[in-house]
Amino acid sequence: MTIGGAERLLQGVRQELATMESRNHFVELVAEGSAPRERLAALACAELLVVPSDRRSFAFLAARFPEAPAGELFLSLAQREGVALSHLGAFVRALGLDASTISSYEPRAGCQAYAAYVAWLALNGSRSQVAVALLANLDAWGSFCAAVAAGLRRHYGLDDDAVGFFGFFASPPPGFLELGLAVVQSGLDAGEAPEASRRAARLLQHYELAFWDTLAEGLTGEGSPEPHASGSAM
């Protein structure tokens, strides 16, 4: 089996997404030290919901598609989310968030849309849909995490342990691209529609940007924040 078709599909999707990507105002604010600490708390609380959801979604995908290479990819992603959750705990502690603050956090729709769509894909998507969407989103997510980690160190006094969650996601695990392409190709070989994968990638990228845009609402003069509980993190 060759992966030429998968590579061409992913390349085309990445080129399309590059034309739609907009500035990430929240990451820019963190990078320059202008994001309020309460918005960092909102980021942590949002991820405390997103990461376990993604972990369950990937575990479900591994059960839906147990045969290699898909089963291997999705199981490894579920395990990786488990590691990420432990790193996230260090970020939460560095911000001084206690159990009461976390439990009173009111989730924002824009911050949970990404995880909700990943869960939808886990239930309804094909293996190539999921793999293309994740591979295409990888560059943006990784670059955002790298910039946040650097900004947190430089401007907020957080050490490597505290920013480990973002450093963990700043680069893909070894072999992830190759394994992902193999999953895409196996789906294409089985007759899965390339356009469905393109559509999934576009939607996931929109939801990725919506996550960060929601965190930046009211800080950049663009948009208006959604209602949330008084005194709680966004």
Spans of model-derived segments:
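Acidic, low-complexity proline/glycine-rich segments
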Residues: 1-27, 105, 109, 174-178
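Active-site-proximal alpha-helical scaffolds that flank and shape metal-associated catalytic sites
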Residues: 8, 69-171, 206
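Alpha-helical bundle segments that constitute or directly flank the non-heme di-iron/ferroxidase center
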Residues: 12-21, 27-64, 124, 129-146, ...
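Small-residue-biased structural context
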Residues: 23-28, 34-38, 97, 150, ...
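Secondary-structure edge/capping motif, primarily at the C-terminal ends of alpha-helices
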Residues: 61-65, 152, 156, 187, ...
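Transmembrane alpha-helical segments of integral membrane proteins
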Residues: 177-186
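Acidic, carboxylate-rich catalytic segments that either coordinate divalent cations
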Residues: 192-234
